[in-house]
Amino acid sequence: KRSGYNNIITVEKKKLNLIFQEKVIAFLKKKKPKCIFLAAAKVGGIFSNKKFKANYIYENLMIQTNIIHGAYKANIKNLIFLGSSCIYPKLCKQPIKESYFLSGKLEETNDAYAIAKIAGIKMCQSYNFQYKTNYKCLMPTNTFGPNDNYHKLNSHFIPALLRKIYQIERSNNNIIKIWGDGSPRREIIYSEDIADACIFFMNKKTKHSLINIGTGNDFRIKEYVSQFLKILLPKRKIKIVYDRSKPNGTPRKVLDVSLAKKYGWTAKTSIKEAVFKTYDEYKYSQK
C-alpha cells in the first residue's frame, strides 16, 4: 500500500485451502489478479523439518503447484515465487551463486522442504519456456520480521531466539540455551526488505528467472545471540549455554547477491532496526 497499490487481494486459509486445486483455480479465475506473489508455504525449524518430512514435501508441492498452474489456467502472466536458500547444496562454495543450483547434495535435515521448493522453481521455468509466462523465482536468505512464527518446536532460529530473550526479560532467569555449538554462519534479512524486493522484481524486466535476495553478509550463530542480547537486554548479564547434542545444520550459508544488485536492488534495513521492530511487535502480541 505504501508503494501506491490499492487493489490488493488476500485470502485466509480457512476460506481457501491452497491444497485443493479446483478451488484455487476457481478463485484465481474469479479474481483475475494482474500478478501473484506466491509466499504461501509450510515452513519451520530444524526439529519440525526432520520430524515431519512428509508434511513438508506434500503441502509445499500442492500449494505451489496449484497456484502456479492456476495462474496459467487463469491467464495470469506475472508471478513471483518465493523459494529458499536451502535449495542450494549443503557443502558448496560461498557465497552461493544462482549457478550452484542443482550442483550437489542437499542438507539432510530439510531436504523434503528443499526438494519441494526446487520443484517450484523448475515448474516456473518450465511454464516460462512452454507457455511464455513471466514467472520469477526469488531465493531469500533467512527471513524474520513482524508476525513471525514463534512456536517452541517449529520456529526458525531468529524468532526462536527472540522468544527466549522475551522469556528472560520477564523473569529472573539469566541463562539462555541455544541449539548446536553456535559455530554455523547465517545470513539474515528483514521481511519488509523481502517485500520490497518482490515489488521491485515484479516491475523489473530481467533475463534471469532465479535471483538471490539477501544482504550478502553473514555471522556466526553465537555472534547473533550476543548481538541481540546487547541490543534488547543491555543491562542484563546473560549466560549463553550451547546444547551440542542438537544439530547445527549447514555450516555456512550466505548468498551471492551481486545479480540482484546488478538489477538495482539492495536491502535497506539494518539488523538493529529490524530487531527492534520485530521484538516490539512480538512483545505487543503477548500482552
Cite the ranges covered by each PLM segment.
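Flexible, glycine-rich beta-alpha linker
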Residues: 17, 87-89, 111-112, 136-158, ...
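Conserved catalytic Lys-bearing alpha helix of Rossmann-like short-chain dehydrogenase/reductases
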Residues: 61-67, 116-124, 158
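Conserved Rossmann-fold NAD(P)-dependent oxidoreductase catalytic core, especially the SDR/UDP-sugar
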Residues: 65-110, 136
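Conserved beta-loop-beta element that borders a ligand/cofactor-binding pocket
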Residues: 83-84, 121-149, 159, 170-177
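NAD(P)H-binding glycine-rich loop region in Rossmannoid oxidoreductase-like domains
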Residues: 21-61, 73
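Rossmann-fold cofactor-recognition segment
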Residues: 9-22
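C-terminal substrate-binding subdomain of Rossmann-fold SDR/epimerase-dehydratase oxidoreductases
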Residues: 2, 167-287
